Amino acid sequence: MFFWLMCYLVDVWLISASDVGHCPDPLLVTDEFSSLEPVNVNDTFMFKCNEHCIFKGSNWSQCRENHTRVTHSPVSKSRDCGPPETPTHGYFEGRDFKSGSTITYYCEARYRLVGTQHQQCIDGEWTSAPPICELIQEAPKPAELELEKAFLAFQESKELCKAIKKFTQRLKKSDLTMEKVKYSLERKKAKLKAKMLL
C-alpha cells in the first residue's frame, strides 16, 4: 500500500492501508503526527510539506515485516530564519526574517565590517556566518611621530641634563609645544586605559 503524509509543521495525513501487522506511526521530528489509520507491513508512505516549511531527510519510508521503517523520519522546520546575530560594535537593518528576505550589516564609527555585508534567508538558514566589526587602527600623525622620536632621544641619553636639552631641541625642531605634548600624552593614557578594560 502507499500513503501520502502532508505536513504543516503539525498536521500529517495518512491515506490507504492494508490488514497485516502494523508499524509504529510515522513521526515528523519536532512535529506532531495525526494518523487516520495505522501503517501496515509493506505500506509505503511519503512526507510532503506545505510551501512555508521544509524537512531534512528522506521524503519516503516503508513499513518492514519486522515492524520497523526503511528510513528514519525527517526533521521538519520552518523556511523562515530566526533573528540573526548582532556583531559587537555593529548592527543590522531588516526586520523580515522570512525565506527570501535580506538583511544588511553595518558597523559603528571607527569600525570596519569584515565578512559579508548582505545576507539572505534561504530555507531557514542565513547564507553566511555573521560578519564582525573590527577596530580601524589610526595611522600616527606626523606630530605624534616626532614626539615619539623626541622621547626615544630622551631615553637614549644617560645624562639627565643632556637628555632634557635634546628633548626640547627636537620639540622646537618639529614645532611641538608643551601643550601639544601634554595633549598627546593624555590621548595615549586614555588609549592604554581603554585597552586595559577590554
From Swiss-Prot:
GO terms for biological process: complement activation, classical pathway; innate immune response. The gene is C4BPB. Residues 22-77, 79-135 form the Sushi domain. Pfam families: Sushi. The keyword tRNA processing does not apply. Disulfide-linked complex of alpha and beta chains. The keyword Repeat applies. GO terms for cellular component: extracellular region. It comes from the Eukaryota. Keywords: Complement pathway, Disulfide bond, Glycoprotein, Immunity, Innate immunity, Repeat, Secreted, Signal, Sushi. This is C4b-binding protein beta chain. It comes from Bos taurus (Bovine). Residues 1-17 form the signal peptide. CDD domains: CCP. Glycans are attached at N42, N59, N66. PANTHER family: COMPLEMENT C2, SUSHI DOMAIN-CONTAINING PROTEIN.
